[in-house]
Amino acid sequence: MYSLLEKHLNFYESKNENIFNYALLSLKQEYENKDQEIFNSKWRKENGYIPHGTRQRTLITIFGKLTYKRHRYLIWNKNGYRFIYLSDIALGVKKYQRITTHLQIKILSLIAKGKRYQDISDCFPHLNISSNTITNIINRTKLDSLETIIMKKTKTINLDQYLYVNIDDTFLNLKENNKKQQYRIRVVLFHTGYDLEKSRPDKKILKNSRIFMFLNKKNEYYDNQLIFKKIQNIAKIFYNNVDKAKIIISGDGASWIRNCQRYWPNSIYILDRFHMIRKLRQLFNPNNKLMQPVYENLRTAFFNGNYQEMIKILSKDWFNDQYKNLKLKELKYYLQQNEQNQGISNQKYDFNIGCSIESTISHHIKWLLGYGSKAFSKKIYLKILTLHFATVNKINIIDLFKENFIE
């Protein structure tokens, strides 16, 4: 049985290798035919390009390593003769290029789709692409800032009634000048609610979702007024009628998010359910038979936007433990601070559909790092995020690459 399986696998591996070899042979003929066409051309002779032997060149293509011959020419300029390879120019192959432009764009497209380095290497097992090679491709790619790309390439969406803005920070270690430093990534997720056609009972799909981010060192000061002004400007690039819509802003209860109405007059603040429920579970463990009813009552009161009921429950003496009493006091203070901006009482309204920022950060920020302790270069990671966020924002990445690869 084992020999039969081995024979089956070897058969398909052999066929796969034959296909790649055929493609490489065909590509070699194309390249060398182009070179011969230039060699025989009247144009080449009339412009004074003098043949000076042939040289081999090796390129890494999507099919494997391609080695082909092309003619070398001498051409006179004001400083004397210099060597030139006309077929390289005609085929778009740069002087020190090792990997075809086609393969580079394939790799960058995978980066833009959220693939990690190992995923990309696994896509091309026959090429043995290293992490350094992928990093070098990203590093050499010229990219505008995410904001500039959005301004140039975004198609505006018409808003109906609500625009949801989910905001949160996450912190990552990135390298700058070969030193690890902690950076804050402030992620902003925009959407217009759930897509009723695509959503299922067990999986909600956001409609017209767009994403933006700010990247700064952890200890750098953010001017909240400027931040919200930038968020509003980005929202107006993504959507029409932003000033007339109801803006539903959700977050973890940080003071700068709670006070959004100071900077965005037509906005409403709602505390992210995830953070409140997590705090309740940590203090009133639902797996504890004594605490489970308390947890359920608090949870129900929270979902109903009943702030007074929550305070009433939390005002009772539940614990003899000093540490837990301190946490209980902190929880009451957290509730009070959020209710100052109606973050609790707004839970009961129909427009409260929850907040998706935690999963957004997990899927689009931490996933790209691989959830490990690795530290990317800040420059490289910013380019990775820019490419990925552009894809999430429905921007045609291939068009973006064409602009960057055509000189």
Task: Label the predicted regions.
Residues 1-29, 75-407:
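Catalytic center-proximal scaffold of phosphoryl-transfer enzymes
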Residues 24-99:
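Basic, low-complexity segments
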